[in-house]
Amino acid sequence: MTKADFISLVAQTAGLTKKDATTATDAVISTITDVLAKGDSISFIGFGTFSTQERAAREARVPSTGKTIKVPATRVAKFKVGKNLKEAVAKASGKKKK
């Protein structure tokens, strides 16, 4: 699904115009981005938690050349799936919860 498809679905589901749905979607994405850029996390109970995590420096190999390179330490975004989302996806795929 593309962002445009998502916006159309949000507009239809919430009874909004596409312009309002675009504004709302852009605001949510921008806010989540700003929160993560500050190193904070944001939780939506049942849906999941967006957070950041430090990734240590490491050595990696370039598959095409076999050359080893050093990858610097960095902070990356991560998402932990919430219970309700996990169950909804499992139910939709026909799999049972472990």
Curated annotation (Swiss-Prot):
Gene Ontology process terms (BP): chromosome condensation
Key words of the record: DNA condensation, DNA-binding
Keyword DNA-binding part of the UniProt annotation: yes
Top-level lineage group: Bacteria
Cellular component, GO annotation: cytosol
GO molecular function: DNA binding; structural constituent of chromatin
Task of the protein: Histone-like DNA-binding protein which is capable of wrapping DNA to stabilize it, and thus to prevent its denaturation under extreme environmental conditions.
Family under the similarity heading: Belongs to the bacterial histone-like protein family.
Protein name, as recorded: DNA-binding protein HU
Organism the protein comes from: Campylobacter jejuni subsp. jejuni serotype O:2 (strain ATCC 700819 / NCTC 11168)
Native organism taxonomy: Bacteria, Pseudomonadati, Campylobacterota, Epsilonproteobacteria, Campylobacterales
